[in-house]
Amino acid sequence: MQRSTRQQAGREAEAFALQFLQRQGLRLIEQNWLCKRGELDLVMLDGDTVVFVEVRYRRHSGWGGAMESVDFRKQEKLVTAAQLFLQHATAWANHPCRFDVIAIEGEPGNAAPLNWIKSAFDS
């Protein structure tokens, strides 16, 4: 699969995840927030809790499943990016936080299995 096709599939998976989370009552704060240490796919608000959501998509699990791709190294990058986000967006700095993962396997939007893991890891 070419890079642009993979990027498009990733964007579709993120849009699918965002719609799902909004239907669950979460509100979007930021999408694709970039910093020198990485990117936060979705920053959401669940009640008064700031939720950093990593969206992982795999068309098939031949190279490992979507959830398995959020290894310790990726978790460290997400925690660092979240810390930088909270330093930048100080309005959220005193709110409780958690890290969720949305793992999607198959074709996004076509009844693809979506697995939402709340509090997938700790900082």
UniProtKB/Swiss-Prot annotation:
Superkingdom: Bacteria
Gene Ontology molecular function, alphabetical: nucleic acid binding
Annotated disulfide bonds: none
SUPFAM superfamilies linked: Restriction endonuclease-like
Family designation: Belongs to the UPF0102 family.
Cross-referenced NCBIfam families: PRK12497.1-3 (NF009150), YraN family protein (TIGR00252)
Protein name according to UniProt: UPF0102 protein Psyr_4114
